[in-house]
Amino acid sequence: MTLSNCDSLDNLFQDPPEEEESSKFVEAVRTLMNRNDMGYPPAAANGTYCLKKIKSLNAKQWKINKKRMCMLPAVKKKNFDFHEQRSLILNLNLWKFIKFINCSSKNNYNKNNKHVRSSNNTVKNENVLPLQKHKKVDNDQRLENLFWRSWFKARKRRDIMGKPRERHIKFNDNVEQCIITDEHFIQRLPSTRLNSTDEQRPCSKSELDPCIGNAASKRSFYDYNSVYVASDAIITTAAATAIISSNSGDYQRGHDVRDVPRNVLLQAGETDFSSVLRVDSDLKLSNISHHSPVKPSSTSSHSTFIFESETDTDTDTDAETENDIDAYIDTSIPNLLL
């Protein structure tokens, strides 16, 4: 390849004149290249331009390029993963740190004979604390601190990820009735969390008003086999305490209706179960007043939970509640995601 061939080499990248004139695309590209100063090299520089290209293609470079083309493509290099590197430190190099820590509180960690310290460099006063002996933190101490800091962070993160995150449900913004986890299972509150100071007495008519009696009422949920949900757009109160059954199956208990919504508790003492759904331990819903399953209303912004609480007196809704609980069993409808 000589300098006389430079014109022919440049012509390889150009179209014939008649095709260039007839092609609007080539004209647009040429205009764009001229605007950005990306045109072809001038005629005066053709000799130097071709000479540089010829000189760069020497025999050694050509062999290297040919050899690389024959080789298999290299594996893509992974990005640096801090968590992976930390796990390697925890798993593979743990014995080094244990050996370093168990050296009778003296920094005798020998790393390529560069950090060996004699006992003469340490303070001989036994009353001085070990942390006060070396004011200057060396590389080994810094490495140890980094290890334990990362180890405790990893352990704390593992404990947090192992436990289910809890969302505390509050009713009337005055008491936590139960704990519902992200796995949508209702957990029983321990006995220490129950409100023992809350007196269980028959409520007066003034306490039936959700705006008056709920401010001082604190109820806890006991039995998880008979949870009732009132899902209605008319309901404005998100709190309800009601209709109870003990763990032994004895339904002859009074109902604390101080937190029951107005649309559930009627003036005649009869309970309207048209908008009340039963939730069993598997979080399956079924209607109480009708045997057909009912899904919660999608227009309502919340669901009212009627939890059970034990009282000493009976009310008029006892018999009706007992019959409804015994008569209607939950049917198969999709689970309610709380």
UniProtKB/Swiss-Prot annotation:
GO aspect biological process, one term: cellular response to glucose stimulus
InterPro entries noted in UniProt: AreA_GATA (IPR013860)
Region (Disordered) location: 1-21
Pfam families: GATA_AreA
Molecular function as annotated in GO: protein phosphatase regulator activity
A single GO cellular-component term on record: protein phosphatase type 1 complex
Reported function: Regulatory subunit, binds to type-1 protein phosphatase. Functions with HEX2/REG1 and SNF1 protein kinase to regulate growth. Might regulate SNF1 directly or indirectly.
The protein's name: Protein REG2
Taxonomic source organism: Saccharomyces cerevisiae (strain ATCC 204508 / S288c) (Baker's yeast)
